[in-house]
Swiss-Prot record:
Belongs to the AVIT (prokineticin) family. It comes from Bombina maxima. Residues 1-19 form the signal peptide. This is Prokineticin Bm8-a. SUPFAM superfamilies: Colipase-like. It holds the Pfam family Prokineticin. GO terms for cellular component: extracellular region. The keyword Cytoplasm does not apply.
Amino acid sequence: MKCFAQIVVLLLVIAFSHGAVITGVCDRDAQCGSGTCCAASAFSRNIRFCVPLGNNGEECHPASHKVPYNGKRLSSLCPCNTGLTCSKSGEKFQCS
C-alpha cells in the first residue's frame, strides 16, 4: 500500500510539473520527439503522453490538429503521418 501511495504522488508531481519530459509524459507537442504528438491519455484528459503519429490503417481522429500543435490535445490519437489523411472507413476513421 505504501508503494502504491508513492506511485500516485510521483504521477501527480509529473502531471503538474513544468520540467523536462523524462517518462514520455508531456504537455505540448514541442516536448515530444519527431514522429510523435502529445496526446491525451485514454483514461484521463489531464495526463498526456508522447504517442506516435498514425500509420496506414491505424485509427485516427478527423479533427486532430496538425503537428506541432501549441495547445493541449483532447484526443488520445495523434494525426496521421506525413502523406496520409484521416478518412472514414466503415464506422471508424483511419489513416490512409
